[in-house]
Amino acid sequence: MIFVLDVGNTNAVLGVFEEGELRQHWRMETDRHKTEDEYGMLVKQLLEHEGLSFEDVKGIIVSSVVPPIMFALERMCEKYFKIKPLVVGPGIKTGLNIKYENPREVGADRIVNAVAGIHLYGSPLIIVDFGTATTYCYINEEKHYMGGVITPGIMISAEALYSRAAKLPRIEITKPGSVIGKNTVSAMQSGILYGYVGQVEGIVKRMKEEAKQEPKVIATGGLAKLISEESNVIDIVDPFLTLKGLYMLYERNANLQHEKGE
């Protein structure tokens, strides 16, 4: 059984794969202040709830865009699982040809998504990941990672309205009853949702025009389903794209180590 861990700025998503299939997954808040023991006890409870234990896990891979949290997570893996985790970063074999000016600037989550997207859906491809930031990644027909777009995430936009406008409340991100809001909350919900749908459609349209291609558009992340239901440019929603990519990278690198006799 392989344990995969995707750490974002707001949430961390954990999963366990068995024989190539995602058996279970969990989502928890990213907490930069938790210790290795606190993370260990939390993961222990999650596993035990599914009838699993640390001993069932034979390998671990971690992707993180939050560097301060990595020490605690690596120590947790070594202390409780007795396994040194594979970390997505320099030295890991991704198989990606990255055309960024500085490939090291490409976030681990974007690399993992690209690996999974190419394997599952082919190319050319646009991957939209609705996280703390919303990222758009373009992979051309030759399976080269060409770059993309980064925008503030939906929750950041909603929180900015709440924190910077004294009379506007904090809202739930959900579809309002109508585009034309009849009260402050529904007007804000309409602005956030349909404003974001417009952003997605506009950026995807411009990316396609610049690439002179008609790539398939894959959406992932917590709010992908909500946005896709209102948009006409998203072809597939894959909520577990990142976890699948982590598993693929683990298998690829574990096989390479085995071939080298490590």
UniProtKB/Swiss-Prot annotation:
Swiss-Prot/TrEMBL GO biological process terms: coenzyme A biosynthetic process
Domain of life: Bacteria
First-level EC class: transferase
Transferase listed as a keyword: yes
Pathway: Cofactor biosynthesis; coenzyme A biosynthesis; CoA from (R)-pantothenate: step 1/5
Compartments, record wording: Cytoplasm
Annotated residues for binding of ATP: D6, V7, G8, N9, T10, N11, A12, V13, T132
One function term, GO molecular function aspect: metal ion binding
Essential cofactor(s): NH4(+); K(+)
Reactions that this protein is recorded to catalyse: (R)-pantothenate + ATP = (R)-4'-phosphopantothenate + ADP + H(+)
Residues that hold substrate according to the record: Y100, G107, A108, D109, R110, T184
Residues at the catalytic site: D109 (proton acceptor)
Repeat in keyword set: no
Listed EC numbers: 2.7.1.33
UniProt keywords, alphabetically: ATP-binding, Coenzyme A biosynthesis, Cytoplasm, Kinase, Metal-binding, Nucleotide-binding, Potassium, Transferase
Cofactor note: A monovalent cation. Ammonium or potassium.
Job of this protein: Catalyzes the phosphorylation of pantothenate (Pan), the first step in CoA biosynthesis.
Listed HAMAP family: Pantothen_kinase_3 (MF_01274)
PANTHER family in the record: TYPE III PANTOTHENATE KINASE
Subunit details: Homodimer.
Protein's name according to its UniProt entry: Type III pantothenate kinase
Organism encoding this protein: Bacillus mycoides (strain KBAB4)
